[in-house]
Structure formats: C-alpha cells, structure tokens
C-alpha cells in the first residue's frame, strides 16, 4: 500500500468566508487547503477514501492527490 497526501478544501465555506459569513456546519479553516494523509492501493482508492469522509455533495473539493514521500535525514 502507498501513502498519499490529499489536498482538500470546502468550496461552500470558501465562498461564505469571502462574503464575510460563516458556514453553519464547517469552521472557516475549511476555506483553506487541508492536507490529509491516507494509505491506499492506488490514487483512485485514495481519492475514494477521502470522498467518503468529505463528500463532494457537501462542498468538499479534492485539489490534489500525490504520493507522500518521507524525508530522510542525511547521515
């Protein structure tokens, strides 16, 4: 399995924040990108995991899905 970093935001929240309002359900931080790590067999399955937790019908947008690489310290 591969670790992916998925970039997500909420379009409804972003629109309301830009208008100086607040979403009744989600906090204002959802207007900005959030980076969520998931482990999946492939990119499509990583996307499906995120969409099940953050449904597009509730305004969530997946901006990017990328393999997550661990940085190793130089010895």
PLM segments and residue spans:
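A short beta-strand micro-motif
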Residues: 3-12
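Residues at beta-strand starts and edge strands
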Residues: 2-4, 32-34, 60
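Short, mixed-charge low-complexity intrinsically disordered segments
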Residues: 43-75
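A short, exposed loop/beta-hairpin motif centered on an aromatic-Gly-Thr core
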Residues: 26-41
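Residue-level signal for secondary-structure boundary sites
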Residues: 14-16
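A short, structured loop/turn motif at beta-sheet edges
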Residues: 1-4, 40-43
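A short, structured beta-strand/loop element
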Residues: 18-28
């Amino acid at each position: 399995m591969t670790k992916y970093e998925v970039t997500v935001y909420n379009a409804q929240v972003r629109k309301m924040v830009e208008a100086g309002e607040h979403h009744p359900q989600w906090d204002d931080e959802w207007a900005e990108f959030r980076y969520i790590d998931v482990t999946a067999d492939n990119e499509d399955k990583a996307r499906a995991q995120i969409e099940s937790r953050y449904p597009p019908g509730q305004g969530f947008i997946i901006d990017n899905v990328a393999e997550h690489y661990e940085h190793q310290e130089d010895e």
